């Protein structure tokens, strides 16, 4: 059973053949011919291909995504209400800070971090809304960035996922070490030849990265998350959108 999907389309490719049976980390989408998939239709096509290869679209899952609109729409259109989306909190913070002068970034960064550390959904949302209100007058673009998709950054709060596991699932960070190791392998290649060889080099990179894999934080609580997702009804897993 696959219960959690991490997607960060600015990362390296992860061939489907090397995915875990329980946890999927999707990097940059490549099709079978090695073509980079950044637009909606191609990302949607890849997800449909996963279904043809055995992925059950009717099973509720938690999808951890960055802020990319194409992958967000593709997941929604393919998996519908069974897709519970957790937007990456790290990407959200980074986007908000990009609209602020350097003198303001540290304070806002700390405030957002403390807000997301709240266990209860209402407390976290209240603090984030307060930050947005404080930014609205002087930095309206930063405030708008914070409010855009805010609910989806709080999916782990609404599910009441325990602390250690929540730290893992609140962002796309768990895939970064694997991506870094893969990039280290690919960086040595001066000529990929063709798309097939590009995929082979990517696979080799992730096999090398696998040697350094460790248990994720909160791994003992994964069964709790699985039960939470299995027990969700259609009405309770749907996250409001801004």
Residue positions per predicted region:
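A generic short alpha-helical patch detector that favors 3-5-residue windows
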Residues: 35-39, 63, 85-88, 100-104, ...
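Amphipathic alpha-helical interaction elements
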Residues: 35, 52, 80, 97, ...
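Conserved beta-strand -> loop -> alpha-helix junction used to position metal-binding or nucleic-acid-contacting
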Residues: 60-69, 74-113
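N-terminal low-complexity segments that are often proline-rich with Ser/Thr-Pro
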Residues: 1-33
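Alpha-helical elements of the RecA-like P-loop NTPase motor core of helicases
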Residues: 41-44, 72-73, 144
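Acidic/histidine-rich catalytic cores and adjacent linkers
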Residues: 69, 118-242
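Active-site beta-loop-alpha junctions of metal-dependent nucleic acid enzymes
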Residues: 34-56
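Intrinsically disordered, low-complexity cationic segments
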Residues: 5-8, 40, 90, 200
